[in-house]
Amino acid sequence: MIIKEISKNEFNKFSLNHIQNSYFQTSNYSTLMNNYKYDCLYIGAYKENKLIGVSLILYKSIAPLVKYGYAPRGFILDYLDNELLEEFTKKTKEFFARKNFAFIKINPELIYSKINIKSKKKEVIPESKKLVSHMRELGYQKLRNNLYFEAMLPKYNAIINLKKFNKNSVNNKCYVKSHSIINKSLKLKKGSLMDIKTFYEFIKEKSNKTLNYYEDFYRVFNKNDMVDLLLIDVDYYKYLEIFKNKLDTMCYERDEINNEFLANPFNNDLYLKKTDYDKKIASLEKSITLINKKLKEERSKEIIGGILAIKQNNKVSLVISGVNKDFTTLNYKYFLYYKTISYYKRLGYSFFDLNGISGNFTEKNPYKGLNNFKLSFNPDIYEYIGEFDLVINETYYNILWDSGKLRKEFIH
């Protein structure tokens, strides 16, 4: 086997339809990361003049004359072919040792286990368990378990089979909230590069990326029609009408409860019901005040949320989503996701990747809300094999750990 640098065209031809490919292993992503302190190269593994594996390698200097590499979502090759993996690993280490690399970080999109959505128990794939052991023997350092979101990319992903997705496949809460009468004031529409700035306002608090990054992201992937920005547009006149009708109904129902409570002032259930209505009515009144303010500012329609997604082969991957938090009474995040997923189902895609969830399925999980929201769409839950460092130069690697440079680079 020979490992050598290959052209972008050679890389694209091999990788674009390979089963191991992801949007992280594309020349588009390489172009993007060139703008953010990474250099890049494409490598190919040839055996008997046949290309049998490739990878995008992002790299940067981390110390004088020392570099590290990153193969996002791993090398593109058959990991289960032991002989191939052994030879590829050996030749890759030799190739990058000559370039003064300390290590190459990888996080392959290879399934380690499938998690039962009800019992939350793992069904580990025996071949994947053997693979992890084999990789360790070959010099791949297995890193943190990444139960939450400690690593470069999520270890646990929720993926919807769009062939099976319908109104009966989601849980009841999800269906009710995504089909609420309030959603009649909402419309899903396709955005453009011009809308990224508005969209960024909804995601900036949960992303460590800049506005420029997302504008570049859209620009780069849009060249191949691989990216969509789907937005929610609200009609405030319709919204106001619906909210006023809802407020009238709730006030009438609260008056009925108040009358019952006056007749039974020591009934605790009635008291709790009354206070619950008081809170909901106060929230509605707050929203109506806010809508009236926007209408006075001549803002009859406004974008209030969106999803950035990548389309690749038969799969759509959610990159990031966000919503305007002004209206706590409007659960339009369910509407946003349900409509987006339905949109791609109609277009004929097979899978929708909801992106990462936490691997902690207990009640004490700090990301319980995120998990519950995504699981309400009844996805399949997969655990990938995790993040590894392929150590190229053990001396350099240990010095980098001992000096704290790796912690500074990767732990935020």
Feature locations, PLM:
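A conserved beta-strand-loop-helix scaffold within acyl/acetyltransferase catalytic domains
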Residues: E5-E48, I52-P64, Y140-A151, N157, ...
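C-terminal catalytic domain of photolyase/cryptochrome flavoproteins
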Residues: T31, L41-Y42, G356-H412
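Acyl-donor binding region in acyl/amide transferases
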Residues: V66-E150, G305, Q312-F377
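Alpha-helix boundary/capping detector
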Residues: K37, K244, Y344, I399-W401
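Extreme N-terminal starter segment of soluble prokaryotic enzymes
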Residues: M1-I2
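Acidic carboxylate-rich catalytic motifs and surrounding loops in phosphoryl-/glycosyl-chemistry enzymes
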Residues: E109, N145-E150, G191-D195, N355-G356, ...
